[in-house]
Amino acid sequence: AICTQDSYLFSIAFLACAAANKHIILPGNYQPCALAELSEQFDCLLVDDSIGEVEVSDVRNIQTLLDTETREPRTDNLPPVDLAEIHLTLFTSGSSGTPKAINKTLEHLDIETAQLDKNWGDLLKGNRVHSTVSHQHIYGLLFRILWPLCSGVPFARSNLEYPEQILSHANKNCVLISSPALLKRLKNEINTAQLAGVFSSGGPLPTESAHQSRNLLGHLPIEVFGSTETGGIAFRQQESAQTPWQLFDCIEASLNSENCIKLLSPYIDNNNWYQTADECEMVSENQFILKGRTDRVIKIEEKRVSLVEVEKRLEQLPWISECVVIPFEEPERLILASVLVLSEEGQAKFATMSKGKFWLMLRSELRKWLEPIAIPRKYRIVDEIPLNSQGKRLTSHIEQLIKS
């Protein structure tokens, strides 16, 4: 297994493991206890100085290995590896809360890297890559490590973690690999900087944040829609919330009876269709509008409620910039609860009325669209939705906000 925050040391370890025909394990979490919990998945853990002490039988520091290596470096070419035989395991959030292992081969990643270069090779050429996302996950692995390596493009070994760092490093030769988690935090910045290009993936990017990124960084972000299981599916630059997604040209798609998209993709399996839980509307053979996840449907008092629809109805109100809706167990019943980020108009409205009247106003508006059972009964107002560095919602943090 490889777990580092240093992308240079990660690249050395990754290529060495591939050359040695090893099965590569990429934990998605840097925390020592989480790494120890995955120890049955690997024989040896390769780390850098950023990783704390881990209770694993064989832990090796990559920099120490490099510093103490006494053999002469090889100058001849290494023998080619069979990419289809080099296996890789990544981890994604499982519905049970336990990390879910996703298996791929380097051949899958090689095909996807070639597709990225086909689409945007000219954007990368002659520039350098900065990133705000981890290489331990598939988006960062592809966009900040493998694609630059295969294209001979330099990349930063450390993450940019704050909006001001993005702006201080930004120039016309910088391509930024980012996520909604950080791009949304640019809203309070006033300085501008011209980048060569911006990519975003890992979660939905609000239209307001996409336009703010264009104002500050010179480009609408290229959003990439996909998952650990599927790899990239489609991309867009969001002029409006209804801007359709464009399939990568090596992928075929169709809808099942529930209007969920299924894929025939070389990133997964060339011969078998892969069914997703993403509800879509096909607007052409290779473009679609994303409606939401059908697996975010719950039952409350025997009625099916789509959490995605409730969020959509809240966010179409002029007072709400962004929200998340979750089921919440009260002693006697299951209800919906929502964490809200107010728009400027919403903040002004909230300041002129009591909290109770504001909630009543929201509920009154939602009744135009939703059954009473689907209207959230608890609300919390925050400055931003809790997200991890990949742009995924931090459910435990959201639950704590509701309980507080």
Region spans (language model):
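Conserved AMP-binding/adenylate-forming
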Residues: 1-30, 127-135, 304
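Gly/Ser/Thr-rich phosphate-binding loop
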Residues: 187-241
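AMP-binding/adenylate-forming catalytic core of the ANL superfamily
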Residues: 279-374
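Conserved pre-ATP/AMP-binding loop-to-beta segment of ANL
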Residues: 72-91, 122-129
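AMP-binding/adenylate-forming catalytic domain of the ANL superfamily
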Residues: 368-390
